[in-house]
């Protein structure tokens, strides 16, 4: 029997014991009292009574051992740019974004819609939401206004985080006009729109609603934003299905179970170790991007490579 077969057999023979062991891969502010509650199957509850935070486990807990280690590499073959962030630098950027969101009125349990290209600020926004207990809903960048409007109406975000434009296959895709039209079509009206200006396209602002990320980022420098400890079963994000088989459906992920499953997969599926680098050819608008561009590698203490471009075009 191979090692992977042995692990699989153990998980089937004693699921509660197995997952209790895997739960030690992350930090818990409050220990869980029950690994698995299947009393309302198939609506299983994981790590009942435990409290944790995705951002803490992806960023903060690594600072003591690897603050200077690379955490996020960003490469854009679209704009011929590259940036890298250590765990300490990532912590600073995420803290700033969290302070901005709080300054715009976002509280625990609020939804934040992220409609962005593959740029570091998109990851900052996701982690910042996790930090303060907000629920992010990432929409694939460049989605048409009608599709975006449907997700705005369903998620009902307090704040939208977006950018002037993305670039794909050498073509600039202006996001702001698509977003403005989507909000015009929506019954729900977000209170604020936070905008990252990449200077790729014109970005007219709507007074009283649109906010400049760069200005806010300077304003909140040095502000400390503690992690909000969430019950294991509280939602971490909502991600919509593509809609190819009907109306898009919002799929909600919990916090504790998701973190433990990801941390476990990084070793047993990907053989990832702290200090390694992982590249996942996906987009944060899809679940693979959530799990294996942003959260999974960081939970494992690895560096993640975020790529703006298409895998088939250099």
Regions found by a protein language model. Give the residues of each.
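Conserved AMP-binding/adenylate-forming core of the ANL superfamily
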Residues: 55-56, 72-127, 144, 148-149, ...
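Conserved adenylation A10 loop of the ANL superfamily
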Residues: 79-81, 238-250, 266
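Structural core segment of the AMP-binding/adenylate-forming
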Residues: 127, 131-215
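Conserved AMP-binding/adenylation subdomain of ANL enzymes
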Residues: 259-277, 287-314
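A short helix-loop-beta submotif of the ANL/AMP-binding
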Residues: 98, 111, 117-145, 155-160, ...
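AMP-dependent adenylate-forming
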Residues: 36, 58-85, 196-207
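A short N-terminal helical cap/helix-turn-helix that marks the beginning
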Residues: 10-33, 50-73
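Conserved pre-ATP/AMP-binding loop-to-beta segment of ANL
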Residues: 68-70, 193-195, 207-240, 247, ...
């Amino acid at each position: 029997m191979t090692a992977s077969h042995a692990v699989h057999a153990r998980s089937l023979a004693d699921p509660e014991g197995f997952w209790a062991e895997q739960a030690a891969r992350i930090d818990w502010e409050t220990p869980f009292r029950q690994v698995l509650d299947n009393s309302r199957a198939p609506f299983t509850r994981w790590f009942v009574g435990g409290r944790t935070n995705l951002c803490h486990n992806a960023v903060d807990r690594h600072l003591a051992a690897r603050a200077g280690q690379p955490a996020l590499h960003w490469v854009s073959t679209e704009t011929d740019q590259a940036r890298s962030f250590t765990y300490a630098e990532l912590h600073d950027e995420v803290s700033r974004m969290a302070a901005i969101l709080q300054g715009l009125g976002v509280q625990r349990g609020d939804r934040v819609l992220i409609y962005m290209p593959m740029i570091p600020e998109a990851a900052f926004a996701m982690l910042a939401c996790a930090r303060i207990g907000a629920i992010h809903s990432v929409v694939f960048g460049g989605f048409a206004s009608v599709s975006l409007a449907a997700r705005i109406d369903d998620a009902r975000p307090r704040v939208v985080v977006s950018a002037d434009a993305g670039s794909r296959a050498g073509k600039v895709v202006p996001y702001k006009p698509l977003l403005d039209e989507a909000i015009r079509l929506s019954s729900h009206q977000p209170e604020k729109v936070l905008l990252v200006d990449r200077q790729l396209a014109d970005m007219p602002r709507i007074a009283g609603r649109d906010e400049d990320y760069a200005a806010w980022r300077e304003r909140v420098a040095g502000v400390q934003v503690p992690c909000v400890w969430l019950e294991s079963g509280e939602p971490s994000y909502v991600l919509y299905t593509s809609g190819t088989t009907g109306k898009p459906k919002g799929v909600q992920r919990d916090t504790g179970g998701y973190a433990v499953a990801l941390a476990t997969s990084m070793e047993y599926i990907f053989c990832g170790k702290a200090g390694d680098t992982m590249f996942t050819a996906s987009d944060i608008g899809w679940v693979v991007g959530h799990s294996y561009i942003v959260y999974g590698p960081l939970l494992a203490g690895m560096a993640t490579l975020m790529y703006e471009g298409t895998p088939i075009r250099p």
